[in-house]
């Protein structure tokens, strides 16, 4: 890279070369190259912001003009954030961003503090200035489809499909994180009718409430899908049981039902729904 380019420009170009938008991360994992790429715009923006903050600091504090020079101060930068009391989640995000920037592993850096599920605060408190009663149709739609915010924004009537084998409607070709496509069940006839009443080619929802706690509605959807598939724990072979750890110790789930719910949400690992969806729903007063 030319020496006369600013260190910010060097960050931008380095991360831009790693963009794999629209490519399947699953296949990259099979090839062993997944760690080399960035598969979503949101991840790219996060990594870019954290990396730029680092090189600005390295330039101001140590006079660094190239990424190679700044590399010597990565551990100092991470330790600075640990000492300042930044959360383990912020520490890990910084480390992950810089590992992507330098094409290495976070294990090559100063260890960050351990992240604990109990410290996650998203969707555990009511979001101010949002009335679920006044937005009931939208909230019910979210709970019936389990879509992410950007997936709702991009939803068209063409995504609705009738499955003759089951006699039920599905959402098909939903483009999730990293460009992954999935199909997901619709849990209410009202949601189906709302889609059917939308003109072809038009967004199903032209306006999406900015303060809606969509993650919590996805947790409700996950719980419903799980309960529709779950077997009584006592009847499940031990190999099909998922035993939670840490502060969730003692909670047992049906792996098969978890896999169905996980696919419907657009996640590959069932551990994600155990910690961020099923238990999130219990904490808000639900009962599996």
Describe the residue ranges of each PLM region.
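Short, basic/aromatic-rich helical patch in the C-terminal catalytic core of site-specific tyrosine
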Residues: 152, 215-230, 244-245, 261-262
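C-terminal catalytic core of Y-nucleophile DNA break-rejoin enzymes
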Residues: 175-221
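Flexible interdomain linker/hinge and immediately adjacent N-terminus
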Residues: 9, 75-84, 99-131, 175-177
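Non-catalytic DNA-binding core/recognition domains of DNA-processing enzymes
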Residues: 36-105
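Basic, Lys/Arg- and aromatic-enriched nucleic-acid-binding interface segment
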Residues: 120-149, 252-258
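Short functional hotspots where side chains directly engage DNA or cofactors
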Residues: 168-174, 238-253, 257-288
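Short, charged phosphate-coordinating catalytic segments
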Residues: 142-167
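Basic/aromatic DNA-contact patch characteristic of tyrosine site-specific recombinases
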Residues: 1-52, 56
